[in-house]
């Protein structure tokens, strides 16, 4: 059944591919092309910018199934937008890429990055239309961005206390202090480097629990396995686990496990040295067709360390490792050979297994065995380090925050905010914090007076960045119903020397942003600025835009009788 599905899908794909490659193109040059791209950028940025700041608005998004989604998350709004005009849509897609890259690098700051991208591209297009050299504009922009990041790096503050962690999380969760406190509490329980996962709960209240689990540094083999496009994660409840020491290439090796997964209506996680060829194709096909929820992950480590780690996973989940030493092959798999757990989360970089179903006695015995090996190993520091890593993974806890709410829509919106807050908090712990609300970028605009460039066009590139980096703060203020230009002017002219002095849009007052807990992670600000300036200045250097031309309408009716006879289908 699975093999015939593969054959049918190839046959279905061929005409689609032929049509895609044979399509003729439509071109726009120079000013006309950039104007269309700019219109798409403006449309997307307008929708995303509405969500920025403590008084930002919600966005309602139609879903293919179920109720509409309510969100204030910039990257979710950006990804949902598809424009009818293909040239405009191309501009929107490039700005979506800014939001996605920032989300991937820092996990937050996507709305600010989108606002920055629009501001840089808009000003660049104006200057190019006035006759400036686009390459010199780009060079000037790059020099300015480097200077701004250097200034911010010199003025950032390291984060140390639980209160500061809660403040970062609160700001990222759109001012929800409950989210901030719960995340700070989770970090306190499992440590700053500990594993924290966000799940949808089944009660009205949010809950925090520390549970048994393991994380290892290997992510999904293919992005086609992703189940949650917003967070780019694979999330399975009550999955089965197929564990193999060797590479899996043949479809015969995974057919029994796929059949068991299909019959039991449970997702399947495959952990092996590698999964490729027919086996990987079959997994992806089954996932895309909705027949079996499946994900493949490479086993962590190398050599003996990989062998031991996959053995630890087997003990934790109650599964069997398929290995040549025991003459066990995956094609002989039965449900008794498969491990299981409460849930798994797989990202591009790592995998978290929660509450494995292995017997507690076996897990404890394995822990004692590793402890004994650590005591014996006195000379080889590398081996000892690997043993300690294995011990930490088997015996360490995982903090699980279960998000509650009165409806599916409410839970989904809150989960988005928890995800953003967790990412922002990790970024703050990693690289430090800055005054929030766009304040740090506003203050950084003053250092651009010192930038030395080669010519006038490059100076205009610096001016573009000087103007653009005040836009996020201005947008936050305008979303709160205030006059952005006046307040930004006062922050630069009167409070320019006070790095932490900013404007609290929620209370409509000037304040010390660090003291009041309005802060942004340095990593989020840095990633947003670099990604926005990179894509926007490249867009400005575009001279030709090419899209697939619309398909001509199919001819209807018989020859000589346009449209066919009334009430009768056209003859082919």
From Swiss-Prot:
The GO molecular function terms of this record are: ATP binding; ATP hydrolysis activity; ATP-dependent protein folding chaperone; DNA replication origin binding; protein-folding chaperone binding; single-stranded DNA binding; unfolded protein binding
Q: Which residues form a coiled coil?
A: none
Record's subcellular location: Mitochondrion matrix
> What is this protein called in UniProt?
Heat shock protein 60, mitochondrial
Residues where Phosphoserine is found: 485
Q: Which residues carry this modification: Phosphothreonine?
A: 102
Q: List the disulfide bonds.
A: none
Q: Which organism is it from?
A: Saccharomyces cerevisiae (strain ATCC 204508 / S288c) (Baker's yeast)
Q: What is the lineage of its organism?
A: Eukaryota, Fungi, Dikarya, Ascomycota, Saccharomycotina
One Pfam family it belongs to: Cpn60_TCP1
């Amino acid at each position: 059944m699975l093999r015939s599905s593969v054959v049918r899908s190839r046959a279905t794909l061929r005409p689609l591919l032929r049509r895609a490659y044979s399509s003729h193109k439509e071109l726009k040059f120079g000013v006309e092309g950039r104007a269309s791209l700019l219109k798409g950028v403006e449309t997307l940025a307008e929708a995303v910018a509405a969500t920025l700041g403590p008084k930002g608005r919600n966005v309602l998004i139609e879903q293919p199934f179920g109720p509409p989604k309510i969100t204030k998350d910039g990257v979710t709004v950006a990804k949902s937008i598809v424009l009818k005009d293909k040239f405009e849509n191309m501009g929107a897609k490039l700005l979506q890429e800014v939001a996605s890259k920032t989300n991937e690098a820092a996990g937050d700051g996507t709305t600010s990055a989108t606002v920055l991208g629009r501001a840089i591209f808009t000003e660049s297009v104006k200057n190019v239309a006035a006759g400036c050299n686009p390459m010199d504009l780009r060079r000037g922009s790059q020099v300015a961005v480097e200077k701004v990041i250097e200034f911010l790096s010199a003025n950032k503050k390291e984060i140390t206390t639980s209160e500061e962690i809660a403040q970062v999380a609160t700001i990222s969760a759109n001012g929800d202090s409950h989210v901030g406190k719960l995340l700070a509490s989770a970090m306190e329980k499992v440590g700053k480097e500990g594993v924290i996962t966000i799940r949808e709960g089944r009660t009205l209240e949010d809950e925090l629990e520390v549970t048994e689990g393991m994380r290892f540094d290997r992510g999904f083999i293919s992005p086609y396995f992703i189940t949650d496009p917003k967070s780019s994660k694979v999330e399975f409840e009550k999955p089965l686990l197929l564990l193999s020491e060797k590479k899996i290439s043949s479809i015969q090796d995974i057919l029994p496990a796929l059949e068991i997964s299909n019959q039991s209506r449970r997702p399947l996680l495959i952990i092996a040295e590698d999964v490729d060829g027919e086996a990987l194709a079959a997994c992806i096909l089954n996932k895309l067709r909705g027949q079996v929820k499946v994900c493949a992950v490479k086993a962590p480590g190398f050599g003996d360390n990989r062998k031991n780690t996959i053995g630890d996973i087997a003990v934790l989940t109650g599964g069997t490792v398929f290995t040549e030493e025991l003459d066990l092959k995956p094609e002989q798999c039965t449900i008794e050979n498969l491990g299981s757990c409460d849930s798994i989360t797989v990202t591009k970089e790592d995998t978290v297994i929660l509450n494995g179903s292995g017997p507690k006695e076996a897990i404890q015995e394995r822990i004692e065995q590793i402890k004994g090996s650590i005591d014996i190993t006195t000379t080889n520091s590398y081996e000892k380090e690997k043993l300690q890593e294995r011990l930490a993974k088997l015996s360490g806890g995982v903090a699980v925050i279960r998000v509650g709410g009165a409806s599916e829509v409410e839970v989904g919106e809150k989960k988005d905010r928890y995800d953003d807050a967790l990412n922002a908090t990790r970024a703050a712990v990693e690289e430090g914090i800055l005054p929030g609300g766009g304040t740090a970028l506003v203050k950084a605009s003053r250092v651009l007076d010192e930038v030395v460039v080669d010519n006038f066009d490059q100076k205009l590139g610096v001016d573009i960045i000087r103007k653009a980096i005040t836009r996020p703060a201005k947008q936050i203020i305008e979303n709160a119903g205030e006059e952005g230009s006046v307040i930004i002017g006062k922050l630069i002219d009167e409070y320019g020397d006070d790095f932490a002095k900013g404007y609290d849009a929620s209370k409509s007052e000037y304040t010390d942003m660090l003291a009041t807990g309005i802060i942004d992670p340095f990593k989020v600000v840095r990633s947003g600025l670099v990604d926005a300036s990179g894509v926007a200045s490249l867009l400005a250097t575009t001279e030709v835009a090419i899209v697939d031309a619309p398909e001509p309408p199919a001819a209807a009716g018989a020859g000589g009788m346009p449209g066919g006879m009334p009430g009768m289908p056209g003859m082919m």
